């Protein structure tokens, strides 16, 4: 069996730069990373990023460093700011897990990495078991928090739900836990689809009530004639959301609702404007750090 080793990239940032780093890593399709508090300096955080060696040659690594430097608007001595090391595959498979811990979200959810035993004090929570593997995080991104917090106040019982950009499947699992009768998960990455199925199986012991679709949202909707959803969950980047709104409107039933997350605060006004232009009624806007979550509704008399 072929094994692959990993680069581990480490550098320090100001604590308030964490969100913009997360946003850029998600935009680049990089999901294996962690942020560590520095006991001696609360204003700084250590960033650790793991990258498959086979996919990152010297040129790619250099380009990535330039992206980070530009993003942080700094001019550090290059050989002192970034620290690259090589992690063997067998070490990676166990060492990366130490960076994840159970996380409470809102009043009802507990995100539980599958290798950690449940503490009895959390037994009254809705437990979302996650095995993120090497490709996805455990749902600690602020946009995921916002979406889950919004979901816990919605009645999903007997509802039909669409999860766009399902990733690890955390929102699909949450919808099913809250009583959804059918969950459709769409992602253009086969690793994400596999992860969604795996985590659904982990939580429920089967794939009942889950349908998955590989491909871009706009193509999947047209090809499979997906429609009449009670709720649409869309936790992806704002630039991608903008091009999806017309088809999201079409696949919602009358009075159906959509939750958009993955939007920076600086982008929310533009998204709200586009929603209104497409006859979606704004219901609520919530924020967490630099991120916004927007919910909207299709009118009852829409055609």
UniProtKB/Swiss-Prot annotation:
Signal peptide: none annotated. CDD domains: AdoMet_MTases. Gene3D superfamilies: Vaccinia Virus protein VP39. It is an enzyme of class 2 (transferase). S-adenosyl-L-methionine binds at residues 144, 165, 187, 235. Its EC number is 2.1.1.-. It is found in: Cytoplasm. It catalyses: L-lysyl-[protein] + 3 S-adenosyl-L-methionine = N(6),N(6),N(6)-trimethyl-L-lysyl-[protein] + 3 S-adenosyl-L-homocysteine + 3 H(+). GO terms for biological process: methylation. It holds the Pfam family PrmA. Its main location: cytoplasm. One of its GO terms (cellular component) is cytoplasm. GO terms for molecular function: protein-lysine N-methyltransferase activity. Keywords: Cytoplasm, Methyltransferase, S-adenosyl-L-methionine, Transferase. Methylates ribosomal protein L11. Belongs to the methyltransferase superfamily. PrmA family. This is Ribosomal protein L11 methyltransferase. It comes from Prochlorococcus marinus (strain MIT 9301).
């Amino acid at each position: 069996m072929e094994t692959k080793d990993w680069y581990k990239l480490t550098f320090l940032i100001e604590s308030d730069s964490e969100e913009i780093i997360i946003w850029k890593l998600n935009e680049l399709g990089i999901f294996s990373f962690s942020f560590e508090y520095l006991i001696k300096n609360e204003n700084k955080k250590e960033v650790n990023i793991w990258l498959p060696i086979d996919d990152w040659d010297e040129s790619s690594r250099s380009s990535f460093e330039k992206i980070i430097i530009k993003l942080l608007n700094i001019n550090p001595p290059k050989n002192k700011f970034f620290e690259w090391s090589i992690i063997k595959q067998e070490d990676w498979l166990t060492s990366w897990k130490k960076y994840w811990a159970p996380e409470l979200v809102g009043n009802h959810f507990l995100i539980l990495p599958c290798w950690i035993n449940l503490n009895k004090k959390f037994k009254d929570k809705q437990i979302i078991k996650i095995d993120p593997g090497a490709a996805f995080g455990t749902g600690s991104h602020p946009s995921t928090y916002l979406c889950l917090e919004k979901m816990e106040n919605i009645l999903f019982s007997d509802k039909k739900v669409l999860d766009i950009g399902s990733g690890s499947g955390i929102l699909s699992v949450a919808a099913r836990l809250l009583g959804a009768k059918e969950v459709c998960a769409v992602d253009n990455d086969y690793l994400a689809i596999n992860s969604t199925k795996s985590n659904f199986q982990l939580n429920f012991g089967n794939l009942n009530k889950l349908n998955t679709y590989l491909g871009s949202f706009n193509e999947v909707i047209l090809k499979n004639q997906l429609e009449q959803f009670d709720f649409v969950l869309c936790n992806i980047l704002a630039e991608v959301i903008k091009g999806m709104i017309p088809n999201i409107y079409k696949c919602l039933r009358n009075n159906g609702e959509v939750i958009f997350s993955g939007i920076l605060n600086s982008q929310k006004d533009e998204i709200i404007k586009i929603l209104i232009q497409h006859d979606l009624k704004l219901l609520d806007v919530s924020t967490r750090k630099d991120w916004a979550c927007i919910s909207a509704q299709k009118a009852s008399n829409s055609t």
